[in-house]
Amino acid sequence: MRVIVQRSQQAQVSIDGKVRGTIDHGFVLLVGFQDGDGQAELDYIAHKILNLRVFSDADGKMNLNIQQVGGAILSISQFTLYAETRHGNRPSFTAAGNPELASKLYDTFNQQLAASGVTVATGEFGADMQVSLVNDGPVTICYDTDQR
């Protein structure tokens, strides 16, 4: 499982010109799965994201997590995080997880985040989406469960 976390001031996702999800300050997550991912990966990444202290405290130090600042999450599925680019100029996506399983993992992951009390907006798994955001910082963190 791979997740790119971007701290944002605001973000939204649209599908076919219609806004599907929007947040004010919080995180934009780009989420990808590979075959073999399961509940252990979801638990690990959800814990890391919910406890990630990249929001400023009163002294301007990155010391607060998303729950402490009342932030929200915009979660976007993105199989292209598993692009293979070592050979040629056109990426291969064979390392990305089976779409049927990945869709279930994506839904479970978002439910797990929401169960913590954080508002979670989503795109649509497998859809062609337009994502817009205002990066804050910018702060971008990459998680890969193969590297834990």
Curated annotation (Swiss-Prot):
A motif (Gly-cisPro motif, important for rejection of L-amino acids) lies at residues 137-138. InterPro entries: Daa-tRNA_deacyls_DTD (IPR003732), DTD-like_sf (IPR023509). Keywords: Cytoplasm, Hydrolase, RNA-binding, tRNA-binding. GO terms for cellular component: cytoplasm. A Gly-cisPro motif from one monomer fits into the active site of the other monomer to allow specific chiral rejection of L-amino acids. An aminoacyl-tRNA editing enzyme that deacylates mischarged D-aminoacyl-tRNAs. Also deacylates mischarged glycyl-tRNA(Ala), protecting cells against glycine mischarging by AlaRS. Acts via tRNA-based rather than protein-based catalysis; rejects L-amino acids rather than detecting D-amino acids in the active site. By recycling D-aminoacyl-tRNA to D-amino acids and free tRNA molecules, this enzyme counteracts the toxicity associated with the formation of D-aminoacyl-tRNA entities in vivo and helps enforce protein L-homochirality. PANTHER family: D-AMINOACYL-TRNA DEACYLASE 1, D-TYROSYL-TRNA TYR DEACYLASE. Homodimer. This is D-aminoacyl-tRNA deacylase. It comes from Lactiplantibacillus plantarum (strain ATCC BAA-793 / NCIMB 8826 / WCFS1). The lineage of its organism: Bacteria, Bacillati, Bacillota, Bacilli, Lactobacillales.
